[in-house]
Amino acid sequence: NVEYLRMDMSANDLTVIPCDCAICINAILTGSLEKRINFFQSLSLCINAGGELVLVVPSLESKLYTQIIADRWNVDDAENDELPKGKEATQKISNIRQGVTDIDNVPTKHYLKEELELLLSLEGFEVSLVKKINYGWGTEFHKPPKWLKGPYPWDWMVTARKIN
């Protein structure tokens, strides 16, 4: 039997019924460290030992790669982007140190591959697979150059088994 449950896994007072499988696609995106910690702890609580997790999250490596391309070849007029100043600059520096970068002006958590492996292992998961899920340049740029091919931007997909 399959049952679909939609819930805020980052809530402080979450009540979960353990299951055998969880699929989380772009679900752990909050800029809040506290909410991300809650989310990963809730994942651990809601999956039975031996259960499977499929997780898809934005890649920090891909975000940086995309930014390097934008800056180097002035994609979408990147050279005219205004640099933040004062408190905004301080906040952006603090965010990037945690892998939080803006998507459409919304602070969004992006993950390193090794970071995901560590976070999941600390919550009792054994990572089975980490794979790049590629997507087109049109998701990153309004006007991607015609010459721009692969490697393409990507999200991370992780499969993991709950071991304890």
Show the residue positions of the predicted features.
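Core SAM-dependent methyltransferase catalytic element
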Residues: 123, 142-164
